Amino acid sequence: MSGNTFGKLFTVTTFGESHGAALGCIIDGCPPGLELSEEDMQRDLDRRKPGTSRHTTQRREADEVRILSGVFEGKTTGTPIGLIIENTDQRSKDYSRIAAQFRPAHADYTYHHKYGARDYRGGGRSSARETAMRVAAGAVARKFLEQRLGIKVRGYLSQLGPIKTDKLDWEQVHQNPFFCPDADKVSEMEAYMDALRKEGDSIGARINVVAEGVPPGLGEPIFDRLDADLAHALMSINAVKGVEIGAGFDCIEQKGTEHRDEMTPEGFLSNNAGGVLGGISSGQPIVASIALKPTSSLRLPGKGIDVDGNPVEVITTGRHDPCVGIRATPIAEAMMAIVLMDHYLRHRGQNGDVEVTTPVLGQL
């Protein structure tokens, strides 16, 4: 299997399966001298880990990360950083009945056709459990970006099924299990999820992620545009079926006079471009959003086939998130941070000595 590494200079390679012995990753390209501890990563891992509320999977994993290499006396050495998280709460017997079946709208069928074999336990490598290592790697990138460059990456849930948020209060994001920025919507989301869980069904969600303090100049046209790499990174997250940068698909209905982000000496008048112009950061906030599909692993019966092509009724009895979007905010933050870290290093390598006299504009 190829395709397990992301990035050009700041690279992240993950390994492991949902019900395997452990998950791991190798981070290469991190500059030396960054103060780094397991606690730096654990904070974000605790935000993502399962079993933290009644609205997520009840699989109980501590997700305790260990640093294996690349850190000496509390600082990065510039060598590969090895990380590992042991799996401790697998219940593989829950999946024995689907060992020879393909769940609808799942990776079972496509993995089987591609590799001729698959780990059916919890989805194996296709499970979102893999994203724990992305969050750990993203925490390293986030610390560097914030400490060295003043870049802050953060996200929130903006829609759960039919429920859309009306307010953006960053302080509120950390006060509820949904990462919801609108306190008035939390009880509605709780009631909706309680009813959904009783039905045995699932629902999708939308996550917004924002990076502030990004300097102008990051991005490598033509094929490695900043927004192209960001879309790639976000689209690689399990269950993501749509990505928007800035105004996204709303720009279809916008006229040019409305969509263009006019500039004044005091700053930009809008940010429909999402902080990226021509594939290069403009100095405005980088704004992206993702749409996550409802999980297909349900206890409600659905039509599928077995390995011989015979029709079967598929019922999934494992522990699953009724809304995968509830725990996706830290993952989206991590992937944006990894992209920005990679592009900062690439920009520094080629254009670090470029100086212009034009002032850097903010957003009014």
From Swiss-Prot:
The keyword NADP applies. InterPro entries: Chorismate_synth (IPR000453), Chorismate_synth_AroC_sf (IPR035904), Chorismate_synthase_CS (IPR020541). One of its GO terms (molecular function) is FMN binding. Pfam families: Chorismate_synt. GO terms for cellular component: cytosol. Disulfide bonds: none annotated. Keywords: Amino-acid biosynthesis, Aromatic amino acid biosynthesis, FAD, Flavoprotein, FMN, Lyase, NADP. Belongs to the chorismate synthase family. This reaction introduces a second double bond into the aromatic ring system. This is Chorismate synthase. It comes from Marinobacter nauticus (strain ATCC 700491 / DSM 11845 / VT8) (Marinobacter aquaeolei).
